[in-house]
């Protein structure tokens, strides 16, 4: 696919090949530092990466930023176990991505899938779901309090400008956000894309991390 065509496609999806969460926050970094303000990285953390409490499929309590994202390369997507739409396809794609990335997952990159229906998706339900897709170590399935999940969804940009569409949880399950937190590199791509494309996109931020 030509670069121009790919950019147009990603634009239609509301995505971009590689974008900081908020480029406008990075511009005044020198002035902010001189004034003793927050660093660009801290601004991104404060605005887009809330440190909400979550539970893994193993019942472990974790905090989103401190335990899952800080100093890491991650993939982030939303789903729910009883989804009959595209969730299974996206999850199956991510399982293939995990296989393609191999030993990088759990070492260089960490995969996080977050339930949009925490009232149903208990750790036990998530564990069964993870097993169904043969998820390996390095891929965590997460649930939490509904208000915390909603804050996380909105902060990460999984939203629709139409309020009615935004209420529809199925509108927020088709994309995958990935990023290198310490380098402030964040992007997104369609979860229905080819696993090879997804893996290549994620590998880009891994290579950036290794210089």
What residue ranges belong to the model's regions?
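N-terminal secretory signal peptides and thylakoid transit peptides that target proteins
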Residues: 1-20
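C-terminal segment of N-terminal export signals and the immediately downstream linker at the start
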Residues: 23-55, 62, 104
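Conserved helix-turn-beta segment immediately C-terminal to the redox Cys motif
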Residues: 91-111
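Thiol-/selenol-based redox modules, centered on thioredoxin-like
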Residues: 166-211
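Thiol-based oxidoreductase modules, predominantly thioredoxin-like and allied folds used
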Residues: 108-121, 138-147
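Short, internal strand/loop/helix patches
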Residues: 128-173
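A short beta-strand-turn-helix
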Residues: 53-73
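Short active-site neighborhood of thiol/selenol oxidoreductases, capturing the structured segment around
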Residues: 68-86
């Amino acid at each position: 696919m030509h670069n121009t065509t790919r950019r147009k496609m990603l634009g239609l999806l509301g995505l971009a090949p590689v974008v900081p969460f908020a480029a406008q926050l990075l511009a005044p970094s020198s002035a902010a530092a001189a004034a003793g303000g927050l660093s660009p990285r801290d601004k991104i953390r404060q605005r887009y990466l809330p440190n909400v409490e979550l539970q893994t499929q193993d019942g472990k309590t974790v905090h989103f930023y401190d335990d899952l994202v800080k100093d890491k390369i991650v993939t982030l997507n939303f789903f729910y176990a009883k989804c009959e739409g595209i969730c299974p396809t996206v999850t199956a794609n991510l399982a293939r991505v995990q296989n393609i990335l191999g030993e990088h997952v759990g070492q260089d990159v960490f995969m996080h899938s977050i339930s949009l229906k925490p009232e149903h998706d208990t750790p036990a339900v998530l564990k069964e779901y993870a097993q169904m897709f043969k998820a390996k170590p390095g891929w965590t399935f997460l649930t939490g309090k509904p208000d915390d999940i909603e804050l996380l969804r909105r902060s990460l940009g999984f939203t629709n400008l139409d309020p009615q569409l935004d209420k529809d949880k199925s509108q927020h399950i088709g994309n995958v956000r990935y990023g290198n937190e310490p380098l402030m590199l964040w992007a997104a791509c369609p979860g229905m894309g080819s696993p090879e494309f997804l893996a290549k996109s994620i590998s880009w931020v891994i290579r950036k991390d290794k210089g």
